[in-house]
Amino acid sequence: MHTDNTALAESPGPAIDLDSLYAAPAERIQKAVRDRLSDFHEAYLRQASFFCLATAGERGLDASPRGGPPGFVQVLDERTVAFADWPGNNRIESLRNLQADDRLAMLFLFPGLDIFLRINGRGRISTDPHLLQELSEGRGTPKTATVVLVDEVLLHCGKAIHRSGLWNPSSQLDRSALPTVGQMMAALTQLADATAPAMDAAQQEQANAHYAHAVRHDLY
């Protein structure tokens, strides 16, 4: 049973005076926000293997994961970085959003480290053959790349990592504790059409196997 809290989320209410609740950031933190990459930013990017990409479009906002070998986000110069778009679910919300609104944000996580790197900027989609070749992985060449003009870059403290225990081995989830892909597909099929044939256990296991293979091997 879920309580409907829609009104709580949608009702704006009176404006909250945030400055009365939160202290101003320290001067050193404000000065740490730069409009271009420094050598230490580039050092982190050379080791970066995962980030979340936030974009906005006519239909709303999206956040999408991006991953690759260390350095898959290439530094083109102190104001510009680029990364490839590799196969996913083909929803391509981020790409469509960037065609309507070029603003984006990137949040980098570094395995084992308690620090984040953030980039706010503007992105454009490129099909430049030379750039795509530079961003290729093995025998895979991306169809498109996103070129980012950096407006802001900063390192962000990793308190959230410690609050969550993200890198702690004891925090790793037991896969059996949550529904499988096959089980969720079966439920979604019934939610979309109650008259549709239900997926049996064998079909659910087939979906699980297909997903497990795809996320590990169909990378490029």
Give, region by region, the residue ranges found by the protein language model.
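Binding-site signature for planar aromatic cofactors or substrates
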Residues: 1-220
